[in-house]
């Protein structure tokens, strides 16, 4: 899961 990479606001 690369949440920070795809959605830096998260």
UniProtKB/Swiss-Prot annotation:
Sorted UniProt keywords: Secreted, Toxin
Signal peptide: none
Molecular function per GO: toxin activity
Distribution of this protein across tissues and organs: Expressed by the venom gland.
Subcellular localization(s) per the UniProt record: Secreted
GO terms for cellular component: extracellular region
Protein name: Toxin To37
Organism: Tityus obscurus
